[in-house]
């Protein structure tokens, strides 16, 4: 099989498959999940998917979401990293993270933060270190004018 890594918003045929992978780990209604996934865009936040291709069969097997970290130049936050349950232990998690790292580098980001509650050992094994929390407004960043964001993050 082949693996390909894609921005979800450029590949609308994978929205439902992506929602299923996320809902397997974090339950939400399908409509709520699709609503949030459809906010993925080039200017961030962006949902990225790992697709397994076996001939004509294509299946979403992994996901990550990247948002801008406010108040920290050239920094982004990676969250909602997940691999389909029946595909775990096959190196797909590492592949999602490696491809996500390459994606953010191409976009000009130099620092990548992530959030996790139960996978600290996995990320430590990949070379990540614990740090102080960072702030990302994710899909809501556009709701605040730049001057308010600047004031908020320079307090």
Question: Which residues does each PLM region occupy?
Answer:
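Short amphipathic alpha-helix that is part of the acyltransferase structural core
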Residues: 1-59, 154-155
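Long, hydrophobic N-terminal alpha-helical segment
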Residues: 35-44, 52, 68, 74-79, ...
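Conserved beta-strand in the GNAT
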Residues: 49, 57-69, 74-82
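Conserved residues at the C-terminal ends of beta-strands
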Residues: 67, 84, 115, 134
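Conserved hydrophobic beta-strand within the GNAT/NAT acetyltransferase core sheet
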Residues: 78, 112-115
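Conserved acetyl-CoA-binding loop-helix of GNAT-fold acetyltransferases
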Residues: 83, 89-102, 125
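Conserved active-site alpha-helix within GNAT-family acetyltransferase domains
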Residues: 105-110, 117-151, 155
């Amino acid at each position: 099989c082949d693996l390909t890594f894609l921005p979800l918003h450029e590949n609308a045929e994978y929205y439902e498959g992506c929602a299923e992978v996320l809902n397997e780990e974090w339950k939400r209604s399908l409509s709520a999940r699709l609503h949030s996934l459809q906010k993925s865009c080039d200017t961030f936040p962006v949902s990225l998917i790992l697709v397994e291709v076996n001939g004509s069969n294509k299946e979403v097997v992994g996901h990550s979401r990247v948002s801008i970290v406010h108040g920290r130049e050239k920094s982004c936050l990676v969250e909602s990293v997940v691999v389909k349950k029946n595909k775990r232990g096959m190196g797909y998690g590492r592949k999602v993270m490696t491809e996500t790292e390459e994606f953010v580098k191409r976009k000009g980001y130099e620092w990548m933060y992530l959030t996790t509650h139960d996978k600290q050992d996995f990320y430590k094994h990949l070379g990540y270190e614990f740090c102080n929390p960072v702030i990302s407004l994710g899909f809501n960043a556009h709701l605040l004018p730049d001057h308010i964001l600047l004031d908020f993050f320079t307090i």
